[in-house]
Amino acid sequence: MFGWIHESFRQLVTRKYGKDIWEKIVHMSKFELGTESEIAHYYNDDETLRLVNSMANVIGIPIEEIWEAYGGFLIQFTMETGWDELLRAMAPDLEGFLDSLDSLHYFIDHVVYKTKLRGPSFRCDVQADGTLLLHYYSKRSGLYPIVKGVVREVARRIYDTEVVMKVQERKQEHLDAFVTEHVVFVITQIENANSTQPKSISSKADSQIDLSTGIYEISSSDFSLAFPYHICFDPDLFVEHFGNFIKKTFPNAMRQETRVTDLLELVHPEVPFSYESIKYYKNSLFVFRLKGLGDIVHNANDEAKTVLLKGSMVFIDEGKYILYMCSVNVTTVRELIERNLHLSDMQRHDGTRDVIMLNQSRMSQVELNRTLEETTKKLKKMAQELEIEKQKTDELLCELMPASVADSLRSGKAMDAKEFADCTLLFTDIVTFTNICAMCTPYDVVTLLNDLYLRFDRLVGLHDAYKVETIGDAYMIVGGVPERCENHAERVLNISIGMLMESKLVLSPITHKPIKIRLGVHCGPVVAGVVGIKMPRYCLFGDTVNVANKMESNGIQCKIHVSETGKLNGLKANPSYVFIDRGNTEIRGKGMMYTYFLERNDRKSVWELCSRPRSGEQTIDGYMELHDQSIYQEEGGQQENLTVENGNSAQNNHNNNNNTHHSGRKLMNGSSVDPGSHHIRSPTCTIS
């Protein structure tokens, strides 16, 4: 169906029920929003029926009521959009209006929009009691309720009267190869209390004025000259006489020997060409195609264009003959050329001449509007695509730096470096990562890191910290930057417990056992700011970064190594933390430092910190599973004797062989740690 119908539906629903209801209807009918009501687009019937069925389901009213309401709104919307004067000028009464609907449909289809509408046909009969019988024919079954809404609204708005419509008969008729629905309505006028002068629905009962003043004879040759396209024929369809154009086109046509069907092929209305059909549709517009007349063919690829005649049937001599008064059905100069016709072929009083010349300017405007609509559609699509790309850019920018910093950069504000007096840093890496890289394919390494880092990222978001960056197997987060907070140490320590637990779920591609990680935590001041223009990064600088990195590199696998300041800040925020005293550890560049291992958080279980459900066979708090070493392969080497800090001095029997200094350690492919910042220089690619 024509896109105007879909646009009318959209206007009806949005005005009465709101935009949200229409969007639900569009979604249910499986249209992409914005493509469901393109005026210049032709939708197939299945798409329109799908839209109407969705309206009935969402709004909750029967489909017949949907069609009837649409019929009434269609007249309202049509009059609002520039067709008001045309509709009011069509006829002096409702009967004449209904008889003119066929020609109006044909005009809209073939002149205004040039679409392939399969519109209905109408004919009206006046009954002796003043009621009207409206015959409605349509190749689309079930749409007759539209007629009820249309007729009632036309009577109310144009003729200031109220009518009642009832279906008298509904049947299926076979016309040629089509099955046509034929519905007969009885239209009765009722009194309108709000109208002072209601108009009659029919003027056929008015008195006839005698205009006879004598007989003025005109010869057949003069008549053929005055009306070059006319054809007169009898009820048996034998030609009686015809105009000069027809005679020139068909020189072998003979009076009372040639049938009209030998010369013309009925195009509109779509009914069998017979005397009975002409009688039924006498008030309709008739369009014929001249048979066997294919005119100018400009090149081998052009299709032959036939001439169409458009006019009306007039019964003369008390119905003994039918006079088809018509003119050539062309509306543009291009159509004239394609049919080898000229303006001079038409009578000077023929309004078709004016239509052709006016259409030259109108068509350029219609084409401009169509181009504008298509351009607007493309611009909307481009705007949507641009918005999607903008969101992707924003997401990428937020991956490179905190959201607050990214917002400032997008707004064009200068971002100066800021000093943070206290924050908590965490570093983690994978034990024997170099060996894993040497023995596995790059794909396995990337899969391993992706699995691990997705788990870490979830924990960072869960506890509201910030991931600074990942390089290779090194993962760095910070609490208290860029948003200052009092419990930054608690957040990071909780994340470290979750990281250690989550790492047990990631398997090494070599041993197929859980990987082992080291974690280091330290608190202190840092300076943070955006570095770079083309590839901006949010970086942290200061000795705190170096010490936090040393906590990780001097730690022990599957342990959370915490500095003195890290422990103090953690207990200040949450006294329920339990630390194991490691004792003095020599840190390159810092000398001896007293450090600790984080054992547990008595306030929260591991399952709470990881935001994972506990299975029935697992312990309530999960710390036995957190420190379970049996899941790893047995390894040699003396273990540290660790004492839980309980107010007494702890004996540190730490084996110096396990206290190897890792500051400035070599990474894969010869890369090394820069002891002055968190940046790890590596010739390998960065995996984020």
From Swiss-Prot:
Pfam families linked to this entry: Guanylate_cyc (PF00211), HNOB (PF07700), HNOBA (PF07701)
SMART domains in UniProt: CYCc
Major localization listed first in the record, in broad terms: cytoplasm
Keywords for this protein: Behavior, Cell projection, cGMP biosynthesis, Coiled coil, Cytoplasm, GTP-binding, Heme, Iron, Lyase, Magnesium, Metal-binding, Nucleotide-binding
BP-aspect Gene Ontology terms: aerotaxis; cGMP-mediated signaling; defense response to Gram-negative bacterium; response to hyperoxia; response to oxygen levels
Any one Gene Ontology molecular-function term assigned to this protein's record: oxygen sensor activity
EC number: 4.6.1.2
The protein's required cofactors: heme
Cofactor: how and how many bound: Binds 1 or 2 heme groups per heterodimer.
Family named by the database record: Belongs to the adenylyl cyclase class-4/guanylyl cyclase family.
Function: Plays a central role in social feeding behavior and oxygen sensation by synthesizing 3',5'-cyclic guanosine monophosphate (cGMP) from GTP. Oxygen, which binds to its heme-binding sites, probably regulates social behavior by modulating its activity. cGMP is a common second messenger in sensory transduction and is implicated in oxygen sensation. Indeed, C.elegans exhibits a strong behavioral preference for 5-12% oxygen, avoiding higher and lower oxygen levels; a higher level of oxygen inducing a naturally polymorphic social feeding behavior.
The protein's assembly and partners: Heterodimer; heterodimerizes with gcy-36, and possibly with other soluble guanylate cyclases.
More about this protein: There are two types of guanylate cyclases: soluble forms and membrane-associated receptor forms.
Protein name listed in UniProt: Soluble guanylate cyclase gcy-35
Annotated source species: Caenorhabditis elegans
